[in-house]
């Protein structure tokens, strides 16, 4: 079993790196504001037709463009969900959503979280799924990538005030990265057996003679960008464990690759743009070390079996509860870590049914800020915050003004870095405390004791860090939970983007300093260890008390 797990992890990472490297080169061209070959004429026509100016923006203008697009998308999606019964492509005549569920869902998909307090096949029409959710899957992913584009440019430019043009970046990211790759993935899913139709639900007779209603819909097209954009919201309630979404072991492997593809490619692009590929490899090493350790821990915990069943004298050699037998425990464990290391949230197994230790690792990966590969764009700019913090700590230890890639890291940058890092832990801890203090919060818990608290902590961690997965034992479709989680998702997304853009605006105005004998190298194993230690230290200090009340207490009981 250990050899199989090692081979699975090694194969996954090897294929991932091979695919991400050329994509990273394409992203590097876009960051450097160089159109991809053959796209210049199309871009010129589109920009003219849409009235888009290619004039560069400062950080405030860039931020306002990103926020404006997302707020407009939020309003449109909210009213679309409220009135979906008036809109076309609704063969099941599904009614509009309640205001609180519509708000929660709109915020969820605009912020790239894709938390779902509903069952897709019984709640949303085809039009809502396509024109509402799928569109936001593209736009939210493009927004995250655009933000990291701006931050990377802040390190490459000197004594400037501009970071690029948000509209140009968003169009290029969507047209030349997200749409083509998602189209290829969708066609592959269709070839493998994923649904893509507009038929009404089909009544069929089962082998036992009973009747069953099979849901239909344009699944493959949404499934592709759901994974590629690290969105995670499933067309069906069972998400990627549903055979209509994820029909074969091969599609399952491609889905995991799609989740990590752009975050990995962005690391390669970062090194290429900086003119020092070692900088990108340093980030990949730090992310990969944490990732491999976490996968190993979850695999080990799930292979040990369910201790509660063992205590009852029942055979439980491996913990298969809540897992698809066609994927097995090792693949389910790998998928769980992939989807929570990235801000995806798609699942092929029920995380609520994992062992205490096996469920704690995905929760902790979210709590440290989704920086282990992370979401498209958001993962890299989240890790860059920890890089700045690590550089600052190193500067304190050696008594020098910290600098990174030639840019001095001053008080302003560190205040903004601390603010961005503290946003999500504050939301998680205060949100969980509020839920446990109120009847409306506690009434959603279906399990008592430490596991019930783990369900609450997981939900708030997932929302605040824009992941979207859940311990499904929590009944979260109520006004209290819909509003609480919507607030956490909104602030957790934009409360980090705003200080990140402010950091970019501050750095782009500075001159680059030549490296000296006292400059800390940020590309070697020493800095990789320092960066990993910084991530672990912040995560440990912040969340160990809360984790001790939930999964740790459950593990020890």
UniProtKB/Swiss-Prot annotation:
One of its GO terms (molecular function) is potassium ion binding. One of its GO terms (biological process) is monoatomic cation transmembrane transport. GO terms for cellular component: plasma membrane; potassium ion-transporting ATPase complex; potassium:proton antiporter complex. The chain crosses the membrane at residues 3-27, 62-84, 126-149, 166-192, 250-269, 280-300, 357-368, 415-435, 480-501, 525-552. Induction: Transcriptionally regulated by the KdpD/KdpE two-component regulatory system. It is a multi-pass membrane protein. Residues 1-2, 85-125, 193-249, 301-356, 436-479, 553-557 are periplasmic. Coiled coil: none annotated. Its main location: membrane. It comes from the Bacteria. Keywords: Cell inner membrane, Cell membrane, Ion transport, Membrane, Potassium, Potassium transport, Transmembrane, Transmembrane helix, Transport. It is found in: Cell inner membrane. The keyword Thylakoid does not apply. Residues 28-61, 150-165, 270-279, 369-414, 502-524 are cytoplasmic. A protein-embedded tunnel connects the potassium ion in KdpA to a water molecule at the canonical cation site in the transmembrane domain of KdpB. The structures suggest a translocation pathway for potassium via two inter-subunit half-channels along KdpA and KdpB, integrating KdpB directly in the transport process. The periplasmic potassium ion probably enters the selectivity filter of KdpA, travels through the water-filled tunnel to reach KdpB, and is released to the cytoplasm by KdpB. KdpB undergoes conformational changes, whereas KdpA, KdpC and KdpF remain static. Part of the high-affinity ATP-driven potassium transport (or Kdp) system, which catalyzes the hydrolysis of ATP coupled with the electrogenic transport of potassium into the cytoplasm. This subunit binds the periplasmic potassium ions and delivers the ions to the membrane domain of KdpB through an intramembrane tunnel. Belongs to the KdpA family. NCBIfam families: kdpA. Has two separate and distinct potassium-binding sites. One site is formed by three periplasmic loops and is inferred to be the site of initial binding. The other site is cytoplasmic. The system is composed of three essential subunits: KdpA, KdpB and KdpC. The complex also contains KdpF, a small non-essential subunit. The KdpFABC complex exists as a dimer above concentrations of 30-50 nM, whereas the complex exists as a functional monomer at lower concentrations. This is Potassium-transporting ATPase potassium-binding subunit. It comes from Escherichia coli (strain K12).
């Amino acid at each position: 079993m250990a050899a199989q797990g090692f081979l699975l992890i090694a194969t996954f990472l090897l294929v991932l790196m091979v695919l991400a490297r050329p994509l990273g080169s394409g992203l590097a061209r876009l960051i450097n504001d160089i159109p991809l070959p053959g796209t210049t004429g199309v871009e010129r026509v589109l920009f003219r037709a849409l009235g888009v100016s290619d004039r560069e923006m400062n950080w405030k203008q860039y931020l306002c463009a990103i926020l404006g697009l997302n707020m407009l998308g939020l309003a449109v999606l909210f009213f679309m969900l409220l009135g979906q019964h008036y809109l076309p492509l609704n063969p099941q005549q599904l009614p509009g959503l309640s205001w609180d569920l519509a708000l929660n869902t709109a915020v969820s998909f605009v912020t790239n979280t894709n938390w779902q307090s509903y069952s897709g096949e019984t709640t949303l029409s085809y039009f809502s799924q396509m024109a509402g959710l799928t569109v936001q899957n593209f736009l939210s992913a493009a927004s995250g990538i655009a933000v990291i584009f701006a931050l990377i440019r802040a390190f490459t430019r000197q004594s400037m005030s501009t970071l690029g043009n948000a509209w140009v970046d968003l169009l290029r990211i969507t047209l030349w990265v997200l749409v083509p790759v998602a189209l290829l993935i969708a066609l592959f899913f269709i070839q493998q057996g994923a649904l893509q139709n507009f038929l009404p639900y089909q009544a069929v007779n089962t082998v036992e003679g009973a009747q069953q209603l099979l849901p239909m819909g344009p699944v493959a097209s949404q499934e592709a960008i759901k994974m590629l954009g690290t969105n995670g919201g499933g067309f069906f309630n069972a998400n990627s464990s549903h055979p209509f979404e994820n029909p074969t072991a091969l599609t399952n492997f491609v889905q995991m690759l799609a989740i990590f593809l752009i975050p990995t490619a962005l690391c390669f692009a970062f090194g290429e743009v900086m003119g020092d590929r070692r900088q990108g490899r340093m980030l990949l090493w730090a992310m990969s070390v944490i990732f491999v350790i976490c996968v190993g821990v979850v695999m080990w915990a799930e292979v040990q079996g369910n201790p509660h069943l063992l205590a009852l004298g029942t055979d439980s050699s491996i913990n298969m509860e809540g897992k698809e037998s066609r994927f097995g425990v090792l693949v389910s464990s790998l998928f769980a870590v992939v989807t929570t290391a990235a801000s995806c949230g798609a699942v092929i197994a029920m995380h609520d049914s994992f062992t205490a230790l096996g469920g704690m690792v995905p929760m902790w990966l979210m709590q440290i800020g989704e920086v282990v590969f992370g979401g498209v764009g958001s993962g890299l700019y989240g890790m860059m915050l920890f890089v700045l913090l690590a550089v600052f700590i190193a500067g304190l230890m050696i008594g020098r003004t910290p600098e990174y890639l030639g840019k001095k890291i001053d008080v302003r940058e560190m205040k903004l870095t601390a603010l961005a890092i503290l946003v999500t832990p504050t939301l998680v801890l205060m949100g969980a405390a509020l839920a446990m203090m109120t009847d409306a919060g506690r009434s959603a818990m279906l399990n008592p004791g430490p596991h019930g608290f783990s369900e609450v902590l997981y939900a708030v961690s997932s929302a605040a860090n824009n992941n979207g997965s859940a311990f499904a034992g929590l009944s979260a479709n109520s006004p209290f939970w819909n509003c609480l989680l919507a607030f956490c998702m909104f602030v957790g997304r934009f409360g980090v983007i705003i200080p990140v853009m402010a950091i970019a605006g501050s750095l782009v105005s500075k001159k680059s300093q030549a490296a000296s004998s006292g400059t800390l190298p940020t590309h070697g194993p020493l800095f990789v260890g320092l960066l990993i230690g910084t991530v672990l230290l912040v995560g440990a200090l912040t969340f160990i008390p809360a984790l001790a009340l939930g999964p740790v207490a459950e593990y020890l009981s």
